[in-house]
Structure formats: C-alpha cells, structure tokens
Amino acid sequence: MIAAAIAPKIDRAILEPALVQLTRHESRVRRVGVTAVQPGEGVSTLARELAGAYARRGRSAVLVEANWSRPSLAEAFGLTGQPGFADIVAGAVAPSRGVHAIDDNLSVVPAGSPSAIRKATLDDGRVEDFLALVDDRFDLAIVDCEPITEIGDAAALSPFVDGFIVVIGAERTRRAVAQRALADLKAAGGAPLGVVLNRTRRPIPKWLYRWLG
C-alpha cells in the first residue's frame, strides 16, 4: 500500500527540477503549498511524489492534506477513518494524533473526518500552532491545497506557507484563466515558488517564462 501510494506517476523531468529547488532552498522554505489553477491537474499526485522523493533523499517530510473537498490521502496510505488535519484544526484531537508515520522519513496528515471538515476553517489559529509543531519535527512540510479558482482555501493558507508550487494542466487550461489565477494568488499574499506544467507535449510558453522571471 505504501509503495503504491508514492509510486512515480509524474514524469521525472517534471518531478526532479521541483525537488532540486526544494532541496536548494530548504533553509528558508520549510512549508510548501501545492495548488493548481483548476481541479484535475494532478496536485495530489505531485504532492505525494514530492514528499516521497524528498524522504527518499534522507530528509524528513510530512504531507498535509488541506484539499478538503477532494481528500485522497487516507485511501492512498491506508489511513481511512484516522484523524487528520481538519480534526486538529477543529480542536477535536491533539496534533500528535493526526500525524501518521509511514516510514522513517515520511509522515502523512490526511484531511480528517467528514464531521471535522464541515466545522474546521483554515483561518483558525490552530493552523499556525500545528505547523509550528511540524517545523520542529520535520525538515519539510508539503501541503496539498485546493485549486486557486475554487473555494479560496489556497489563498487562505498563504500566511502559513513559505510559498506555492502551482500546477497548470497543459493543453486544458486557457492562458487567460491561468494568468488570472496566478495574479489572484499573488494578490492574496501567496509567494509563487514555481510552476509545473503537467501533461505537456510542448515547450513552456513564453508568457509563463515571463511570469516565472
């Protein structure tokens, strides 16, 4: 189950540059949000694989699921029914009960129970309290976030993460939609760390390079 959960599904040419950037800047980047312009662009898959690859390099990583509308980590890691991030934020459990060790270097915090998801909000002070505890235990926290164009929870997490990796689905996301979403994220205080153009068969377009620059 564990091996299947983090088996590579993202092209290595996409995964490796992102991993190199995280490792290079790990002294100042301890919490990374992974989000997308719209649903279905591979955010959860990328977040899982980044966390797994980082852990395989001998560094400790925790994968936190803040994508509460489409939770997937509990099933992927065999944690169905276990408490998670929403339970912690709602004050239903102690933080330690929501963190589940997968192996020596990788832990997972799934979304949590449906009842807690309905009650919890990401502007709660418990979010920062929990992530501060995470900073003490792990080298890196990767937060699986909602899409930018949806509920707004990615923007709500901006004060709590050091920056975002944004996934853009190649050949399915219109340029204007992507540009507007990126601008919205920056306006909300989100620091863009980079963009992953997923499922692409073409070079990265010039407008995206300009944004990255």
Where are these regions (language model features)?
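P-loop/Walker-type NTP enzyme "switch/lid" segment
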Residues: I2-E41, R56-D139, I148, P159
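Rossmann-fold NAD(P)-dependent oxidoreductase module
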Residues: A53
